[in-house]
Curated annotation (Swiss-Prot):
Tissues expressed in: Widely expressed. Highly expressed in lung. Weakly expressed in larynx, syrinx and cranial air sac. Expressed throughout the lower gastrointestinal tract in increasing levels starting from a faint signal in duodenum and ending with relatively high signals in proctodeum, coprodeum and urodeum. In the upper part of the gastrointestinal tract, expressed in tongue, crop, and mucosa of the crop.
Single GO cellular component term: collagen trimer
Name of the featured protein: Collectin-10
Stored PANTHER family: C-TYPE LECTIN DOMAIN FAMILY 11 MEMBER A (PTHR22799:SF1), TETRANECTIN-RELATED (PTHR22799)
Region: Disordered, residue numbers: 41-82
Location within or outside the cell: Secreted; Golgi apparatus; Cytoplasm
């Protein structure tokens, strides 16, 4: 056998031995399947843990999982954009009356009118003047009647009415006469008590009555010029004319009489006769 062939045989023998040795160490057969130990008298231990391999490719998407539990309430989001205008709703009820508006701007002046005819207005002015006087009297009478309706007192023969307008004695006397009456004249105790209660219940303290001594000091006469005779109800110490000008008489809410200055302005009581049927 040549030397060259010996070397080849030795080489192949060495390779076979190494192969068998590897099989014993790793315990795998040619098909990479586990095999039984070559020698039952030897225990083959696992080798050390190898290094981590390279990261594999991304796998396919898995199946959808089950619905999880409801999460906590999130924060309030930002206000969205204004939506489209909705459909027109039903007409609502009529609202209350509004406040009066501000005064508007003055309009444009109108065209100048045509000249009027010449008028003899003198007689018309007189008629208009008299009408104004009559209207003023009528308004005064209407006002008086309205006040009378509000409350009066009466006896079998007369009506009595407190006029709540402050006037002096002469003005009060004329006011009553212009309306067909006169200032009240309490000539007996019953009438005096009626007028006193009238003054008191009206919330007043005093009022003029139709009694005075303007003609002669100390001699009192009624508004109809009849003298003071059988009945009087002077307050203690009255009349005393303390100022020298107390020539008219007022009745107090107590029913007592007091002489007073005629120029003071106070409420007064008118007296009217009842019409006989």
């Amino acid at each position: 056998m040549s030397r060259k062939k010996e070397q080849q045989l030795r080489k192949y023998g060495t390779l076979v031995v190494l192969f068998i040795f590897q099989v014993q160490i790793f315990g795998f057969d040619v098909d990479n399947r586990p095999t039984t130990d070559v020698c039952s008298t030897h225990t083959i231990l696992p080798g050390p843990k190898g290094d981590d391999g390279e990261k594999g490719d991304r796998g396919e998407v898995g199946k959808q999982g089950k619905v999880g539990p409801k999460g906590p309430k999130g924060n309030k989001g930002t206000v969205g954009d204004v939506g489209d205008q909705g459909m027109l709703g039903k007409i609502g009820p009529i609202g209350g009356k509004g406040d009066k508006g501000a005064k508007g701007i003055s309009g444009v002046s109108g065209k100048k009118g045509k000249a009027g005819t010449v008028c003899d207005c003198g007689r018309y002015r007189r008629v208009v003047g008299q009408l104004n006087i009559n209207v003023a009297r009528l308004n005064t009478s209407i006002k008086f009647v309205k006040n009378v309706i509000a409350g009066i007192r009466e006896t079998d023969e007369k009506f009595y009415y407190i006029v709540k307008e402050e006037k002096n004695y002469r003005e009060a006397l004329m006011h009553c006469r212009d309306r067909g009456g006169t200032l009240a004249m309490p000539k007996d105790e019953v009438t005096n008590a009626l007028l006193a209660d009238y003054i008191s219940s009206s919330g007043l303290f005093r009022a003029f009555i139709g009694l005075n001594d303007m003609e002669k000091e100390g001699q009192f006469v009624y508004a109809d010029s009849s003298p003071l005779q059988n009945y009087s109800n002077w307050k203690d110490g009255e009349p005393h004319d303390s100022t020298g000008h107390e020539d008219c008489v007022e009745m107090l809410s107590t029913g007592e009489w007091n002489d007073s200055e005629c120029q003071v302005t106070i409420y007064f009581i008118c007296e009217f006769l009842k019409k006989r049927k």
